[in-house]
Amino acid sequence: RPFNFYKFRSMYIDAEQRRQELLKANESKDGVIFKMQKDPRVTRFGRFIRKFSIDELPQLFNVVVGDMSLVGPRPPLPSEVAEYTLEDRKRLTVKPGITCIWQVSGRSDIPFRQQVALDKEYIMSRSLWRDLWILLKTVPAVLTGKGAY
């Protein structure tokens, strides 16, 4: 179900309008998600807060109000869901999380199809211990900033 997703602003105000002109430069091979390592819409300060996931901190409010959990598949944009296959939609069957298995396995360096596969595997085998393991692995993933853009 859709909900208001809180983040600190890391992009210029006209980022969504500029996205259309940048679609040709999408580095995501499958086109469902939009990723660019050197996205010109991201501010200098935005690069810093994204690298260390500081922009994600407001999502703790989403957890408190029950829209999200600490661990679970990352919430997609409605425009991304519109391009999902039935198989991709399986990742929408659980509450989204601030961190997830592919966040601790390479973050944005992981292609979308692999993200979906990892999310589905997580959904099938989730447990308190697995969530604790993912939370522990999140700390070094955030501190190194590897794969964050």
Positions of predicted regions on the chain:
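Conserved small/aromatic sequence motifs within transmembrane helices
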Residues: R1-Y149
